[in-house]
Amino acid sequence: MDYRALGLKVGLEIHIQLNTRRKLFCHCPPVLRDDEPHFRLERRLHISLSELGAVDPAVVWEVRKRRRYVYEGYRDTTCLVELDEEPPHLPDEEALVTALGVAKMFNAKPFDELHVMRKIVVDGSNVSGFQRTVLVAYGGRAKILGYDIGVETIALEEDAARKMGEEGKAVIYRLDRLGIPLIEIATEPMSYSPQQVEEVAWIIGYSVKITGRAKRGVGTVRQDVNVSIAGGAKTEIKGVPDLSLIPKVIEYEAQRQVNLLKIAEELKKRGVASVELSTVDVTDVFSNTKSKLVKRVLEAGGRVVAVKAPGFRKLLGFEVQPGRRFGTELADYVRAWTELGGLLHSDELPGYGISADEVRAVEQRVGVDSYVLLMGVEAAELEEAARVVVDRLNAALRGVPEETRGANPDGTTRFLRPRPGAARMYPETDLPPIKVTFELLKRAEEVAKVSLEGKIAELTSMGLSKDLALRLVKSPHLEKFEEFVARFKSLPPQLIASIMLNTAKALAREGVEVSEEKLASVFEALENKVITKEAVEDVLRAMKPGESAAEVAKRLGLVRLPFEEVRKIVEEVAKEVGREKALGEVMRRYRGRVDAEDVRRALSELHF
């Protein structure tokens, strides 16, 4: 896919939890708990005008679902702020300093005065119905590892409550995560390839982590990706769980937009100007159906309704992403708006147990070339689903609708809700503006002293190649590497890094687990000259639980020969094969038991 020709633009929003002693707007500890919660309470959310006098479209979308929200909390780590029964406290100062420090890293301009804003979020993940956020800096630009990274904004915001599950129309949330400080870094739109965007996302995330002020572990970093192509629309893809998935998400979203534009072009050629809402009850057609799917609905007292989709023949089944068709997009909308599980459409019938005779009977009844079948018990749900389907069919005439979508594990995406509008954010009335003082900026400078390129320079100064240094920084082993270097001072850092990244990786491909304990034992044996570098792989491969590297070397006959013995061996072999061939011959005969440096030294001391 030629992304430049497509006019691909990608923006990133990187959210990283900060490792603070308190939450952002209260003094509760920022810890996640798995023990039984002490209490539960229930809330419902209702539509009201924002302080700007408007209603956000995403709010309408969520509230129409008529959900109940149940919140779980703990008396010793949850307070009235999280329950929206007490005004917020002033923002955590350490979080502010970190955000200002990260802003300095990216040469972003801090605001002189910070204003806490309310961003409407009505999926229940915020008890109040809004998320508090503070814009800290804007207009940053930095060149890091060859990438020109433009930063639109840097913000602090409170993390949402943890979703624990659903019980019918009730959504269960836990309040332990609500209020944990997040730093959000939003980039300018980029024209890089999907793989390069992944690199940029890693650079941004690592730049925050290297400060030592970010939480580590699963769920502490989340990426949102904004994708558009020429003629398409900005689509926000929420919650890409892993950096390695970013290229696929971008590729598949670009592909989806290309295919939606193809559908729009084809509809134009067919002369389809609009789709009117027109439904036909076809329940009686399926009175003797063999389809388990349909039969289950009918036995529950439900109905089957056909929604007319004139002009969409062969387009409902048109693939827009791998394994996902335009009909799948319609089903996503129906699932998001209603309690129905999905739909069937004419391009996939006969199928799902529905016979050719039943299909012909439906076609005769609806009188158009294509249609969508909806099945359900509640009449109101069927009416709502029919309206949603027709709205999406009409949106297809215009090409690509602006949406917020969720990332699937395979990189494809699904519809979540419409893109929010400007009425989503308004000022927090319970907190005063915060002055960005000279003292705060001075403390922020300390945060900004560390950098990704500075860390790579530090590693290369230890003797690591730039490639190995970059791989080490990208790996989860940097901290342990630094511990090993400090502990085993006589070992070259290059050797430690190579064993951790290359040898351990090769063994992992064989199914051999190389723990930190095993590595420490091997490094100790190397430092004490018990084994050679050449023996490391064999020793790690053979090491049993509780066994030391020295014990394994003895068992395998790979204990390093002392220099005096190496000298005698070298002298004998040199006489036998000649001085020039002696090094290779000794290493071949005594593989894993002699060190190459010892052999070279012995050769240099020969007097013939």
Curated annotation (Swiss-Prot):
GO molecular function, one term: ATP binding
Reactions performed catalytically: L-glutamyl-tRNA(Gln) + L-glutamine + ATP + H2O = L-glutaminyl-tRNA(Gln) + L-glutamate + ADP + phosphate + H(+)
Record key words, sorted: ATP-binding, Ligase, Nucleotide-binding, Protein biosynthesis
PROSITE patterns, sorted: GATB (PS01234)
EC number(s) per entry: 6.3.5.-
GO cellular component: cytoplasm
Chain spans, region Disordered: 402-422
Domain of life according to the entry: Archaea
GO biological process assignments: glutaminyl-tRNAGln biosynthesis via transamidation; translation
Keyword DNA damage attributed: no
Pfam families, per database record: GAD, GatB_N, GatB_Yqey
Function: Allows the formation of correctly charged Gln-tRNA(Gln) through the transamidation of misacylated Glu-tRNA(Gln) in organisms which lack glutaminyl-tRNA synthetase. The reaction takes place in the presence of glutamine and ATP through an activated gamma-phospho-Glu-tRNA(Gln). The GatDE system is specific for glutamate and does not act on aspartate.
Complex formation: Heterodimer of GatD and GatE.
Family named by the database record: Belongs to the GatB/GatE family. GatE subfamily.
Protein name in UniProt: Glutamyl-tRNA(Gln) amidotransferase subunit E
